Regions:
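Catalytic adenosine-cofactor/nucleotide-binding cores of aminoacyl-tRNA synthetases and other
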Residues: 68, 80-171
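Active-site cores that bind ATP or allylic diphosphates and position pyrophosphate for catalysis
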Residues: 1-107, 111-115
Length: 171
């Protein structure tokens, strides 16, 4: 394996402005971590930095389970001389199961696939409208004020996304 020798010190803090969660302060990464596995395949951390640099990615939006990796990613981008993208971490969509909440799963839950809604007779526009109410806190109010406007007129903003996971309630 190939490891990155971290020059970091966990007593130092990094601060970044998450596009969804706001200002986050964390200890700087001081852990040496694998960037190439023994089979020569890059780890997610290394691939993320190189691929996003080459693709000129400006914003990385991903699940909030990746927040703890941001110090590694910022360190890696800086050590490689790459511009650090803006990060936004999205809370998972939750589902009630046996009275408890759990993260909805693309493997376990058919309602995450569009084919499910097609087979149930939902119009694509209705599914899209529902998703917008889950994703952006001001969409429902906008729709009430603009019932005949095309959805493309709605100004989607990351700042209006919820900090906590929405509860998905299928009928």
């Amino acid at each position: 394996v190939v490891r990155l020798r971290s020059p970091g010190n966990e007593e130092n803090k990094i601060v970044f402005d998450d596009c969804i969660k706001g200002k986050i302060e964390m200890p700087e990464n001081d852990e040496d971590f694998v960037i190439l596995k023994s089979d020569g395949i890059p780890t997610y951390h290394f691939a993320h930095a190189v691929d996003d640099h080459l693709m000129r990615t400006t914003h990385v939006l991903r699940g909030d389970e990746w927040i703890s990796s941001v110090p590694k990613h910022i360190q890696l981008f800086k050590l490689l001389g790459f511009k650090v993208p803006k990060y936004g971490h999205i809370s998972p969509i939750m589902k009630l199961e046996n009275g408890a909440k759990r993260k909805i799963s693309k493997r376990k839950d058919p309602e995450l696939g569009l084919d499910y809604y097609r087979s149930e007779g939902y119009l694509p526009e209705a599914v899209f409208e529902y998703l917008m109410t889950v994703l952006n806190s001001n969409f429902e109010e906008w729709r009430d004020q603009n019932p005949d406007s095309p959805i493309d007129d709605f100004e989607f903003t990351l700042e209006k996304m919820s900090n906590s996971g929405a509860l998905f309630d299928s009928l």
